[in-house]
Amino acid sequence: MSAAERMDVFALLAPKRPDHVSLGKALTLFVEREDFGFVWIAFDDNESIVGCVLVSFAISTDAGGLVACLDDIVVFPGARRTGVGTGLLETLATHVRAMDIVGIRTSVPRAFGLESFFSACGFSVRDDQGFTRTLA
């Protein structure tokens, strides 16, 4: 992620994150410490950002290995229901599976109304706080 892309991702996430200082620090860590996680950005045909995912890594005693923590998935309203989010999650699953990561977890609350979206992408409800996808 370049410095310019970092600012674009910040602008995409900032409306839902009141603590802009913490968001800025987290995005800086994603740039400086790729071993901690990564940010993927989805572009449209005009090279405009239409969405992104932020993923960090954690050791899970429940899963018995390393899991990818989907910290955020954001798709611009005009790009929703066009396959951007599904594409991001499917690419994520393929990528982290190749890294021997055993699952993907998210803390996206069920209250956000995304249960059918995550279910269609192979996730199951983990608890009231999120969803999980086991990778074989």
Task: Describe the residue ranges of each PLM region.
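Acetyl-CoA-dependent GNAT
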Residues: 4-65, 71, 134
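Conserved GNAT acetyl-CoA-binding A-motif
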Residues: 89, 96-109
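Conserved acetyl-CoA-binding loop of GNAT-fold acetyltransferases
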Residues: 118-128
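Conserved beta-strand-loop-alpha-helix junction that forms the acyl-donor binding cleft
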Residues: 80, 105-115, 132-136
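Conserved acetyl-CoA-binding loop-helix of GNAT-fold acetyltransferases
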Residues: 75, 81-94, 120
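Residues at secondary-structure transition points
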Residues: 61-65, 83, 109
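Residue-level recognition of the GNAT/N-acetyltransferase active site
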Residues: 58, 76, 109
